[in-house]
Amino acid sequence: MHDIRALRADPAAFDAALGRRGLPASASSLLALDADRRMAQTRLQDYQARRNALAKEIGQGKRQGIDTSMLEATAVALRDEMEALEARSASLDAEQKSLLERLPNTLDAEVPTGPDESANVILKQVGEPISLPFSARQHFELGEALGMMLFDAAARLSGARFVVLRGALARLERALGQYMLDLHSTEHGFTEMQVPALVNDATAYGTGQLPKFTEDLFRTTDGRWLIPTAEVPLTNLVADSVVDEASLPMRMTALTDCFRSEAGSAGRDTRGMLRQHQFHKVEMVCITRPEDSDAEHERMTRCAETVLENLGLAYRRVFLCSGDTGFSAARTYDLEVWLPGQQAWREISSCSNCRDFQARRMSARYRGADGKVAGVPHTLNGSGVAVGRALIAVMETYQREDGSIDVPAVLRPYMGGLERISA
C-alpha cells in the first residue's frame, strides 16, 4: 500500500513511478479524491464540535429550567446531517483505499527499465552450463524411464499439471527440502516455521495477492485461499502488530506445498514438473528495519545461491526489469539454473525487497527501545529454493547415459547413503 503523504509531497514522482510499470498517471485523480475526503473529515469534525456544544447548552438550559426545544430540534437536524456526512466520508475512504490497493509498489531507482523479461540484466554467473558427452534427456524423460515419475497417474487423479513421484525420486525430492531447511535454519540463521496452507482474505491481502490476483489462486468453498507461497502466512505473522526493534531482523523459513492456478500459462511448460498447480518450495522471509533491508536482500539472495552452489548446479543472478518485477516488490533478483536437458536457463528462486509496501497493507509497525513506535518495517521474501525445480536440475545435471542419476554428495545423508538412482 502506498503512503498517501508521499503522493501529496511529490505527485510527479508518483506518476513517474507508475510510468515505469507501464501504468497511466493517477496522481491528479487520487489527490482530488484525497482533497474531497479530507474536506469531508474536516466538516465532520466541525459538526462534532457543534454537536458537543449544543449538548452542553441543552444540559445547562434544562438545569436552569429554560425551554430547550429549539436547541433539541437543531441537534436532531445536525445529527441527520452528520449521518449523511459520515456515510460520505466512509465512501470516500473506501474509494481511495480501493484505488491505492490496486497500484503496484514503487520500483527502486536502480531497477532496469524495460517491458518484459527480455530487458532483465544478468548480474553474475556461477559455473558453466554443463555439456554432457551424450544426448541429454529432460527430467520427465528420465523420470518416466525410471518408472518413478508418473504423470498419467496424476492426471487420472487430479488432471493436468500434477505429478506422482515414486520410490527414490520421491525420496530425493524430500531430501532436497530437508537439506534446504537444515541449511537455512542451522547455518543461515533462519527460524524454521510450520504454517497453515489455508489463509483468509486479510492475509492474502496483506502480501498483495488480493484483490488484484484472485485468478492466480485456488479458493475453497468456505472462502479461504490455498497459499501460492509460504511468503503469505510467514510475512503476515507481524500483521496488525507492533514488534520490538530489538527483535529485528526476524528471519523465518518454511517448507510448504504451494498452489497456483497458472491462469496465464496456457500452453507453457505443459510437459513435466516445471509448472504445476501444486509444488513444494522452501521460502525465506525477513522482517527488518528500513536501513537494513538492502543488506538483508543481498544476504537472502546469497543464502539461496549457497543451496545451488552446494548442489553443484550452474546458475546466474538476474536483476528483473520494471516490466517483469512483481506487484509487491521494489526490486527482485531471480536465480536461474541451467537445465542440460532443456539447454536453457530456468528460474529456480526469486528474492524480493518489498520495502514498506506489504507492512503498510498489513498494518505492521515496530517500536524502539524507548517504547515509542519508530516506524514501518521492511519485508523481504525469497525462494530458498523451489524444491521441484531443484529436483529437475539435479536430475538433468547428474544424469548418466544409461538413464541413471547420481545423487549429489550433500544429499546422500538424507538418502540413506544412496549414491545413484537407477531402474
Curated annotation (Swiss-Prot):
One of its GO terms (molecular function) is ATP binding. Pfam families: Seryl_tRNA_N, tRNA-synt_2b. SUPFAM superfamilies: Class II aaRS and biotin synthetases, tRNA-binding arm. InterPro entries: aa-tRNA-synt_IIb (IPR002314), aa-tRNA-synth_II (IPR006195), aa-tRNA-synth_II/BPL/LPL (IPR045864), Ser-tRNA-ligase_type_1 (IPR002317), Ser-tRNA-synth_1_N (IPR015866), SerRS_1_N_sf (IPR042103), SerRS_core (IPR033729), tRNA-bd_arm (IPR010978). ATP binds at residues 260-262, 347-350. Belongs to the class-II aminoacyl-tRNA synthetase family. Type-1 seryl-tRNA synthetase subfamily. Catalyzes the attachment of serine to tRNA(Ser). Is also able to aminoacylate tRNA(Sec) with serine, to form the misacylated tRNA L-seryl-tRNA(Sec), which will be further converted into selenocysteinyl-tRNA(Sec). This is Serine--tRNA ligase. It comes from Granulibacter bethesdensis (strain ATCC BAA-1260 / CGDNIH1).
